[in-house]
Every structure is written in structure tokens, then in C-alpha cells.
Amino acid sequence: MKGLHLTKAIHAILANAGITNVHAIVAEENTPQPFAVYRRASLSVDDTKDRLAQDQRATLSVQVVSMDYQSGLMLADSITNALVGKTGTFEGVYIDDISLADAAEMYNDTSYLQDLTFDITIENE
């Protein structure tokens, strides 16, 4: 199931766009801000009546953490621009479509947070 490798594909897309300081699942303690953490939040498979796997649908969750609002917003914007509408094969995963499903922002005691949710269609090649 190619969708299980989605985070590798996302890392490749972001790296190719020149976006740095992004981490799969967790960032190490004391990672310089701003940074982003991304993870596959869900994965489902569309089956045919013959139980043949078709497209896979994934949800990608991205959280941007920053000391100041503007730098976090800029990183969130760069990530969104790099991902939305992206198609092709990345790290062996054929991505048919990426769209922004939701975006929220908040502040905790020490950092500004930008939470992004992307819907991704992965084609079963």
C-alpha cells in the first residue's frame, strides 16, 4: 500500500521546493523555530466490488511552530504553496491531487501555531 509511504513523498516535495526545518512526526527538543511537523493522520482505500484496491485517500496534518506570528505564517504559506495541486510520483508514491482542507491558528504559552490539514489522493499504480 503506497499510502503508508506518504510522509516520505511529502518530505521529497518540500525538500524540492527548498523548504527546510520540516520534520516527520516529531521535532527534536530545542529545534530552532520556525519549524513544521507533519504526519499522515488518516489513510483509506477505495475498493471495487471485486475487492481490487483503487485510489487511496489520505489526510496529512501539518503543524507550524514559531516564536513570532509572521515567520510561522510565512512557513505555513510556503508549505501550502508547495503542496496544493502537486501531482506526480515522489519516492515511489503517485500523488494524484493535494488540496488544503482546513487551516487554523492559535497561540500556546510560548509559540504561535499554524495547523494545516491536506486531503491527498494517491493513485494505485
Regions found by a protein language model. Name each.
Residues 23-25, 37-39, 63, 101, ...:
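Residues in well-ordered beta-strands of folded domains
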Residues 30-31, 55, 93, 111:
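A generic structural signal for short, non-catalytic loop/turn and secondary-structure boundary residues
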